[in-house]
Amino acid sequence: MFLAQEIIRKKRNGLALSPAEIQFFVQGITTNAVSEGQIAAFGMAVYFNDMNMDERIALTTAMRDSGTVLNWQSLGLNGPVIDKHSTGGVGDVISLMLGPMAAACGGYVPMISGRGLGHTGGTLDKFDAIPGYQTEPSSELFRKVVKEVGVAIIGQTGDLVPADKRFYSIRDNTATVESISLITASILSKKLACNLDALAMDVKVGSGAFMPTYEASEELARSITAVANGAGTKTTALLTDMNQVLASCAGNAVEVKEAIDFLTGAYRNPRLYEVTMGLCAEMLLLGGLASNETEARAKLNRVLDNGRAAEIFGKMVSGLGGPVDFVENYSKYLPQSQIIRPVFADAKGYAYSMDTRELGLAVVTLGGGRRKPGDALDYSVGLTQVCALGDKIDSSTPIAVIHAQSEAAFTEAENAVKKAIHIGETAPEKTPEIYAYIRAADL
């Protein structure tokens, strides 16, 4: 038996906590035996004094075990349970293609995703643009779709990781969100509660990323890789570029359209293709579905080219309540804005740099993102045909096309887009889509 205040005192004094002490405190978060003030004090003590790797693993597994841990044993799946998670960005539509692609290669992908907040879009918000799609199905339906289709992308259910829900809301209000130890536990407890065999982690870097610097992103990637592997889940983190919009668009319905165009081969943005393939190939390698990257990429290209991945996306949508002909007739179902109009730069030259965060916030001002949790969204609005860094820009080349519901909203977004995309006299140096892979062997 421990006292919460003694655990806080120990961490305040910079000492390491035992797994039993961490387990006790997390249990108290879940049962309300630990007060809000004590949780806030604990968060601040960790923020200033940090945790060693053993403490991080203990915190992550205690939070994972605070609620239901999914069990796939009874379903008799004939392949690995694999997933990916992203720290979030702008135009990050990867999950919509990656899930069906991995399933088409023999994996099972029970992806529990989140909603957008601030400048980053949320995977669930994109699916909410699809009429009838249930982002909060019963656990029976979730398991049925995972088994029969190979992938189901849904929202977090109430009985998964309740400790994180309470802890995170208090961290958000007490300025302790930025702790690497606490971020690691928050992200991984949710993913590990899905009982995965393998996880590919997408840690964004740049002006649209969650972490402020490359160094901070790398530190988070290393922490996640070490803790996840320490907790028994094979994990690799990729550091990927978010200094520009990842897809050619940002929003909800517009990103669903781009995902379907990608799966069917109608259009594949080269940057989006590279990051999607990198993450998906890593999932296949970790899950034992390919023996090297060349083989993994060949398998993924095959399921894209033969239509299998697109077919699986369609089956997932219909299995979770969406239209059966969604892939073939998506334009019939996706909402469309009143105003769809290009925006032009005031100067000519090259797209030199982008404040990706500001472009994400432009989508929020259009009504496509949240200023606070619970805000209603307009799924039709957003940006399309966003230029890529290095593109030649002149008076006849739009830097983006804005989808808005009113002239006032269009004008506000137009000003934001012009401010966020900087035109230079020369093209910038090309940066890689994937900066680094951080595998267990690299730690």
From Swiss-Prot:
Full protein name: Thymidine phosphorylase
SUPFAM superfamilies the record matches: Nucleoside phosphorylase/phosphoribosyltransferase catalytic domain, Nucleoside phosphorylase/phosphoribosyltransferase N-terminal domain, Pyrimidine nucleoside phosphorylase C-terminal domain
Annotated pathway: Pyrimidine metabolism; dTMP biosynthesis via salvage pathway; dTMP from thymine: step 1/2
Keywords carried by this UniProt record: Glycosyltransferase, Transferase
Enzyme class: transferase
Keyword Transferase recorded: yes
Species the sequence originates in: Shewanella sp. (strain W3-18-1)
InterPro entries according to UniProt: Glycosyl_Trfase_fam3, Glycosyl_Trfase_fam3_N_dom, Glycosyl_Trfase_fam3_N_dom_sf, Nuc_phospho_transferase, PYNP-like_C_sf, PYNP_C, Pyrmidine_PPas_bac/euk, Pyrmidine_PPase_CS
Family: Belongs to the thymidine/pyrimidine-nucleoside phosphorylase family.
One GO BP: pyrimidine nucleobase metabolic process
Reactions catalysed: thymidine + phosphate = 2-deoxy-alpha-D-ribose 1-phosphate + thymine
EC nos: 2.4.2.4
Quaternary structure (record): Homodimer.
Family matches, as PANTHER family: THYMIDINE PHOSPHORYLASE
Function as written in the Swiss-Prot or TrEMBL entry: The enzymes which catalyze the reversible phosphorolysis of pyrimidine nucleosides are involved in the degradation of these compounds and in their utilization as carbon and energy sources, or in the rescue of pyrimidine bases for nucleotide synthesis.
One GO MF term: 1,4-alpha-oligoglucan phosphorylase activity
One annotated Gene Ontology cellular component of this protein: cytosol
